């Protein structure tokens, strides 16, 4: 069977399809000799490599025998590869192929019955003897009348697998999956070039890799991938159909001329003879494909076919090393490589654009071989200008040959041709000038504005075109311009937009089939085609409206929904309306029109929002009326009045408030609620101005009442802003104030149950804080009233001092609110409303994870407007708008029915009754100090706030959102103003525990990815690479979380706090110890919440970001540390860099290495509170070594702590401290010297080399660690070392300390190795010995279990990993080798690992991969 299959394979290699461009080294061409066949086959094998060659075999056999199963095709392909290797091996007989071919024909027809269904095979097998031999050897493809590939399947994308099946197949049988894709694509498109089919399979499996290994939303990703491929295949089919129409309309000669231009531009290094031969082959292939009658399956693309043919010309490829390396690739990888091969000529030594032969020889060739000479002229111009359009090359060639004809008939040929060449050069210079202009405009205007310019230009030139056609052509020309302008340095940019426009039109199926006149013009070339299109444009002007659409609701809907496309459509419409207008004038008109639309739509949007807000406020007012009752509603109205008219008395204000409350209740009666359009602010003003007895007699109020309603509102606003108290005078509201009764009157009022005192307190707070929310004023007043009520329960002697304390406490709460408000307003002022609203979007998304994007935007906009109003005064006078409180207010102000389920329950708490629990304890004391009662009152607002704080986030979503590349580019184009916000929402709801700045950074990374990749020539690879980077960033963050939680679980809270104290003291060395300790405990509470089982899935708490957020939230720290306020206005990496560059002011602390303590105090602290002592020591060491590793700082802190213990119990305390300090300073200097050596090694070796050696050291020191952990720990250490080494001094880094710290921070590792837990609890200096003992025990257990080293992964698995992430493969090699050869030096192991990575590429191409790996591994072991 084996021999038969061998012969069968050889036979099929020369079977059919001879004379075509499908010659990837796997078939024989017509009349081709066996020596030449062997040369081609062996050249293809050597050029492609075994893996790619086998892929071509799979494609070839599937195309020829599509009815055969995949198993049979794979068997044929494997035999094919083995035979070619056998016959191409050194020492193989010259007649190897011929000998095999002579004996296989009978085997094909007798052993492969299913192949007879293929028409050509069946026809040959029906013959006998020499006729059969001739049929197999000389058949020229599908016979006439037999039809094209009857076994071909319908045109669709590959079969639809469910995500679980295809991802499992991808993980376990990647090679089989790849063969399946090749088989499926080849059955559906048997006319496509091998390279094209391989490119499709490669792209599809790359997409599968992304969906299965990177993206977590597998189903959505695969569905999008299939849709993209359906579109891609349809587009490729349309290109082929257009090619067929071009061939039919132009004729063979002109078509071949155009192919010469394309092929020359594709391979400018190739000689004319080779280009001509390739162009002819492509013309034959295209003609054959287009005559088959199956154009929907005819995938013939120029670039893949020319690449196939070019790479088979080994004699030429061998002269170009870069070209040779490209040809070793396949599919789109090879296409991309060839596109980046540099043109050989430079501007100084560029080839001429006209033939260099003497005039006599030119005339002879032109007269004797006009067709060939015409092609040579076309080649010469294309060779010189590889970026120009086909039509322009044809026009220049026609121009030159016309004048050559005249010169050849002239008596003085030399003078004539010299004149012609000069004129030709002048013509070329004109085009160069135009090209430079387009390049300058492209650079000057940028992508979007340049696109608008093109749309205007093309809509003027072709007014009968649809918007979609103009937009597509503009995009095409923009890509050409970008490519052309990148070649300006070598003088090859040769671009004129008219020719590019007409080339694009003539390639467009819709144009060719839609207008007969267009087809007629496209059949012409050069200037004739230009004139034809000019005439066409002048006779076919589109009928358009005289004026563009003015402001309307429909126009604003388009403006908001279409985004940038709206601008494109405006440019298109203006170009149609004014085809003769100057471009500068058009730009001015379009700019003015767009500005008008923006103003109009902004005004309409503001008005609509104002109306909605009034309706919403009226609705909320009615809800308050129904739920609170008249008295409580009057209290709230009183607060609003006091804020607006701070000059009025309490009596007047309360009277008007009560009257207005009655009006509201009447307005909100059940029969009128839907029509009650009452906004409290304006209605109150009406009430005030109509009440002549209460307030209107006040001069300032009377003056406001005389104004127009809008001006009146402004006037009342100015009243409250000018009368408001400043931050410094806030204490008046709760301090000694004539408007407040004395303590006797207060207590009498409380005893009688009179609520007027509480109302009076609310009034005083309201008039001093005119921009505070009503609930905040109520909260402050309630706090004071409850404290005062508790004071009144004391004896008369203690009441006054107690009330004074109560007022001070209320004053402090007010001051805190003012400070928070001031911080909010300062932040808003510093980062702007847009950036501030972005942060609100994140906070809302994290709170309401099931809310839609539109809901989040609406709430965020309302909240940002409210905060902006609160902060509209420059000095933020009286603004008590707490961000947390305002956030919840904004969420709950959403109309009923549209609230997300997750937050509806919290908002409904405001409808419940107030829960009050009061515990009163009275203590009478004869001293002046009095312990007041403890009163706890939980209001509805506080219940709501608590509910929001404890919301259980829905974290079942993937870590990163999935949008296809095309979706991202379309979203960026259509809604650029909402693009960033969408990803803030996406990342916020996926990571509800993440630091705000971390969410910002991830969203910005997505935006930058889209900006940089959309419209690029290699956008797919750009997206793939950057998506991987983002996913790795997320995985790294989750690894950080696991490390934090592992550290918390394994070491306990006390040790965790010590670690945070160290980190915080390093991040903010100028902050006080008390503040650092407080922040460390706050971060512990965050970590405990984050590391709880119900939050672990959504926990995205990366330490540096969280620490930065906490530091920046603390007003005291921000005030203490110079420059911190500026940094805190930034976010993400920008803020981290800013904080890293803050100056460390440690000069006043004396010795940099070792902190100095008061010996008496430190011994007292050790006795009374040893935990705080350790924190203080860590704080002092941390701030002195702000760039060092935490484990290093902790090591010396522990040494110092032991010294304190020893010295405090010594009789000679002072002498002991002096001695111990000196010893520790010496050790620190020694460690710094080691750190300097590490930094020198890092600088000399480079980051990559350094990290590889760290991987080896970690894997050798901790054989119990899996590879992923070793790589993760080594990467983190390299990053820390890099940061530490940026500063020349005081760098403490040690690999062993870092490794042990990482192992102790990995909860999963500790659970798997319980013995490590004891090591982690010991002192840092003692951990090394403990870990060594553990590793020795682990190694002994492995020996007993006869599993000394991990088994080598299967060859297929190694190759899968290598193909997917080749840049990370070196890590696997390092890890494997250090476990197998542990006694070798790290530098030697690294060299072997690099060698291993090098031969992996070869072994993964080999047929017997396992044997190849075995042989190579044995070789490097013995080397």
From Swiss-Prot:
Cu cation binds at residue 36. Plasma. One of its GO terms (molecular function) is lipid binding. CDD domains: ALBUMIN. Sequence repeats lie at residues 913-916, 917-920, 921-924, 925-928, 929-932, 933-935, 936-939. Glycans are attached at residues 490, 541, 652, 754, 908, 911, 954, 1070, 1236. Belongs to the ALB/AFP/VDB family. This is Serum albumin SDS-1. The lineage of its organism: Eukaryota, Metazoa, Chordata, Craniata, Vertebrata.
């Amino acid at each position: 069977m084996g021999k038969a299959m061998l012969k069968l394979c050889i036979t099929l290699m020369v079977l059919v399809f001879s004379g075509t461009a499908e010659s990837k080294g796997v078939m024989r061409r017509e009349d081709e000799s066996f020596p030449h066949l062997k040369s081609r086959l062996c050249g293809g094998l050597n050029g492609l490599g075994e893996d790619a060659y086998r892929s071509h075999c799979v494609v070839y056999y599937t195309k020829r025998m599509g009815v055969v199963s995949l198993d049979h095709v794979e068997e044929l392909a494997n035999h094919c590869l083995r035979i070619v290797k056998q016959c191409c091996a050194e020492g193989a007989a010259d007649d190897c192929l011929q000998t095999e071919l002579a004996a296989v024909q009978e085997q094909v027809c007798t052993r492969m019955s299913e192949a007879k269904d293929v028409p050509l095979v069946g026809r040959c097998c029906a013959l006998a003897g020499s006729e059969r031999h001739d049929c197999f050897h000389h058949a020229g493809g599908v016979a006439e009348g037999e039809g094209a590939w009857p076994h071909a399947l319908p045109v669709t994308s590959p079969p639809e697998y469910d995500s679980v099946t295809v991802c499992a197949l991808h993980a376990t049988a990647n090679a089989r999956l790849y063969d399946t894709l090749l088989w499926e694509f080849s059955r559906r498109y048997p006319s496509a070039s091998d390279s094209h089919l391989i490119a499709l399979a490669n792209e599809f499996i790359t997409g599968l890799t992304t969906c299965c290994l990177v993206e977590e939303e597998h189903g959505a990703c695969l569905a999008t991938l299939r849709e993209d491929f359906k579109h891609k295949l349809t587009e490729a089919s349309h290109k082929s159909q257009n090619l067929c129409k071009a061939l039919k309309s132009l004729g063979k000669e002109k078509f071949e001329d155009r192919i010469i231009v394309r092929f020359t531009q594709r391979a400018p290094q190739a000689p004319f003879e080779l280009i001509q031969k390739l162009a002819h082959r492509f013309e034959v292939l295209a003609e054959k494909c287009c005559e088959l009658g199956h154009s929907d399956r005819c995938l013939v693309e120029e670039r893949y076919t020319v690449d196939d043919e070019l790479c088979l010309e080994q004699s030429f490829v061998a002269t170009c090393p870069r070209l040779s390396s490209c040809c070793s690739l396949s599919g789109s990888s090879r296409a991309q490589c060839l596109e980046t091969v540099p043109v050989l000529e430079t501007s100084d030594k560029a080839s001429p654009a006209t033939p260099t032969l003497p005039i006599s020889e030119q005339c002879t060739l032109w007269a004797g071989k006009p067709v060939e000479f015409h092609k040579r002229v076309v080649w010469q111009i294309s060779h010189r200008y590889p970026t120009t359009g086909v039509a322009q090359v044809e026009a220049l060639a026609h121009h030159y040959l016309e004048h050559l004809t005249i010169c050849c008939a002239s008596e003085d040929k030399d003078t004539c041709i010299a004149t012609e060449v000069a004129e030709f050069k002048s013509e070329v210079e004109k085009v160069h000038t135009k090209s430079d202009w387009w390049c300058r405009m492209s650079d000057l205007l940028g992508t979007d504005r340049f696109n608008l310019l093109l749309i205007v230009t093309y809509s003027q030139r072709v007014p009968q075109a649809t918007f979609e056609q103009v937009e597509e052509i503009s995009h095409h020309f923009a890509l050409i311009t970008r490519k052309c302008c990148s070649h300006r340095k070598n003088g090859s940019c040769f671009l004129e937009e008219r020719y590019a426009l007409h080339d694009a039109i003539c390639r467009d199926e819709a144009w060719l089939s839609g207008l007969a006149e267009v087809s007629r013009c496209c059949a012409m070339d050069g200037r004739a085609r230009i004139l034809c299109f000019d005439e066409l444009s002048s006779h076919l002007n589109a009928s358009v409206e005289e004026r563009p659409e003015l402001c309307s609701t429909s126009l604003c809907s388009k403006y908001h929904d279409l985004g940038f496309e709206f601008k494109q459509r405006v440019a298109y419409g203006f170009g149609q309306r004014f085809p003769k207008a100057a471009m500068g004038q058009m730009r001015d008109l379009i700019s003015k029109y767009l500005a008008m639309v923006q103003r109009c739509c902004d005004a309409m949007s503001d008005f609509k929002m104002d109306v909605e807000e009034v309706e919403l406020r009226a609705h909320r007012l009615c809800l308050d009326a129904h739920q609170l009752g008249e008295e409580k509603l009057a209290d709230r109205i009183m607060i609003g009045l006091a804020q607006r008219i701070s000059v009025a008395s309490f009596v007047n204000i309360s009277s008007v408030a009560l009257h207005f409350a009655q009006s509201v209740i009447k307005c909100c009666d059940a029969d009128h609620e839907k029509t009650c359009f009452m906004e409290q602010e304006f209605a109150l003003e009406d009430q005030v101005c109509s009440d002549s007895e209460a307030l209107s007699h006040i001069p300032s109020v009377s003056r406001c009442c005389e104004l127009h309603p809008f001006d009146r509102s402004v006037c009342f606003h100015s009243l409250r802003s000018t009368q408001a108290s400043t931050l410094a005078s806030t204490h008046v509201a709760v301090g000694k104030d004539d408007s407040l009764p004395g303590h006797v009157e207060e207590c009498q009022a409380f005893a009688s149950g009179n609520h007027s005192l509480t109302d009076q307190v609310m009034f005083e707070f309201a008039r001093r804080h005119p921009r505070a929310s009503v609930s905040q004023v109520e909260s402050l007043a309630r706090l004071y009233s409850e404290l005062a009520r508790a004071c009144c329960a004391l004896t008369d002697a203690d009441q006054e001092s107690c009330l004074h304390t109560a007022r001070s406490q209320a004053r402090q709460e007010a001051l805190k609110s003012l400070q928070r408000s001031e911080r909010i307003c300062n932040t808003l002022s510093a980062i702007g409303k847009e950036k501030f609203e972005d942060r609100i979007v994140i906070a809302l998304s994290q709170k309401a994870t099931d809310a839609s994007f539109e809901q989040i935007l609406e709430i965020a906009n309302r909240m940002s407007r409210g905060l902006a109003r609160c902060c509209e005064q420059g000095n933020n006078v009286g603004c008590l708008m707490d961000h947390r409180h305002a956030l919840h207010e904004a969420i709950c102000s959403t109309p009923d029915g549209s609230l997300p389920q997750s937050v509806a329950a919290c908002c409904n708490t405001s409808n419940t009754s107030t829960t009050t629990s009061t515990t009163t304890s009275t203590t009478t004391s004869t001293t002046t100090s009095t312990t007041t009662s403890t009163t706890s009152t939980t209001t509805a607002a506080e219940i709501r706030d608590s509910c929001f704080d404890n919301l259980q986030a829905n974290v079942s979503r993937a870590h990163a959102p999935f949008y296809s590349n095309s979706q991202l580019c379309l979203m960026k184009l259509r809604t650029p103003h909402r693009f960033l916000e969408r990803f803030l929402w996406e990342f916020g709801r996926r990571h509800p525990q993440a630091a705000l700045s971390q969410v910002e950074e991830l969203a910005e990374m997505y935006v930058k990815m889209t900006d940089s990749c959309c419209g690029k020539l290699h956008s797919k690879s750009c997206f793939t690479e950057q998506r991987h980077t983002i996913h790795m960033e997320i995985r790294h963050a989750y690894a950080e979380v696991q490390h934090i939680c592992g550290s918390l679980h394994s070491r306990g809270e006390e040790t965790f706090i010590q670690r945070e104290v160290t980190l915080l003291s390093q991040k903010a060395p100028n902050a006080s110890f008390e503040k650092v300790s407080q922040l460390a405990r706050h971060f512990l509470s965050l970590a405990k919440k984050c590391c709880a089982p119900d939050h672990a899935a959504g926990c995205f708490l990366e330490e540096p970001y969280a620490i930065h957020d906490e530091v920046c939230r603390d007003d005291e720290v921000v005030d203490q540390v110079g420059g911190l306020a500026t940094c805190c206005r930034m976010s993400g990496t920008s803020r981290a860099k800013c904080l890293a560059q803050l100056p460390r002011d440690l000069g006043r602390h004396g010795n940099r290495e070792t902190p100095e303590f008061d010996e008496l105090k430190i011994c007292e602290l050790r006795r009374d509170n040893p935990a705080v002592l350790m924190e203080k020591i860590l704080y002092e060491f941390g701030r002195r070594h702000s760039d060092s590793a935490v484990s290093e700082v902790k090591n010396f802190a522990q040494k110092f702590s032991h010294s304190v213990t020893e010295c405090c119990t010594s009789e000679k305390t002072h002498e002991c401290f002096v001695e111990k300090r000196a010893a520790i300073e010496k050790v620190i200097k020694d460690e710094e010297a080691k750190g300097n050596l590490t930094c020198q090694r890092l600088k000399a070796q480079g980051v990559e080399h350094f990290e590889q050696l760290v991987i080896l050291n970690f894997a050798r020191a901790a054989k119990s660690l899996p590879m992923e952990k070793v790589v993760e720990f080594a990467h983190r250490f390299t990053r820390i070392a890099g940061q530490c080494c940026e500063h020349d001094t005081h760098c403490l880094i040690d690999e062993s300390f870092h490794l042990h710290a990482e192992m102790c921070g990995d909860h999963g590792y500790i659970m798997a190795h319980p013995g490590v837990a004891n090591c982690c609890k010991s002192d840092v200096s003692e951990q090394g010995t403990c870990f060594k003992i553990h590793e020795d025990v682990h190694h002994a257990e492995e020996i007993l279990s006869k599993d000394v080293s991990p088994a080598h992964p299967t060859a297929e698995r190694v190759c899968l990993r290598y193909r997917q992430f080749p840049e990370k493969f070196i890590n696997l090699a390092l890890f494997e080798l250090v476990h197998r050869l542990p006694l070798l030096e790290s530098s030697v192991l690294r060299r072997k690992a690099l060698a291993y990575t090098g031969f992996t590429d070869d072994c993964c191409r080999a047929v017997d991969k396992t044997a190849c790996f075995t042989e190579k591994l044995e070789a490097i072991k013995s080397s």
